[in-house]
Amino acid sequence: MTRPSAYLSRALAAYRRTGADLPYGDPRRAHGVAMEGYFWRVTDRDRGRSLIALIGVNRGPRGPWATLGLAAWPDPALTVTATTQGYADPARLGARAGSAFVADERRVEVDLGPGARLSIEVDEPLPWPQARFGGSSGFHSVPALNQYWHPWLLGGRVRGTAEVGDQTWELDGAQVYGEKNWGKGGFPDSWWWGQAQGFEDRGASVAFAGGQVSAG
């Protein structure tokens, strides 16, 4: 005989596989939807540098695959690739694609080839405060939306380096921001987003997003 607690656990797991989260849940964990995206931005205010790293873990009819990206400014550098490997962690924030991209809440390791590498650890993280909902507010609890969004890391300092073209950037002390987006079918037809950090007040960070979101 199946115990009531087992029925409840199955029901909650099925609910979360739609992409939704109950109030006070943890939206950082993978949901098992078609796309789980992870994004980091590093801002070195003192040296006038910025870079981003991203991984999108996708679930297709032939199995998981991932899109990977690394970009830098002011030296123009952009590397984007796709791989047949991809994993999003259902127990905590974490994603990987073989040895090309390995990341969790405290580190990001990217190796997309010569001139496109990143290795950082996060110190003094400033996480999203414990609250009823994440960045998508009450829409987190609505099942089967095509897009959810959550800025889980509002600030912190990094230790590490980046290989940008023929340069090696020292990133110790730079600021970091991290977010996650997920949904049943990738990005909506319309989506806009912005994020800023590197202010004189190192605790200040701004992020916003919006788009055409549908359910079903």
Region spans (language model):
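Structured soluble/peripheral alpha/beta segments that form catalytic or ligand/cofactor-binding pockets
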Residues: 1-216
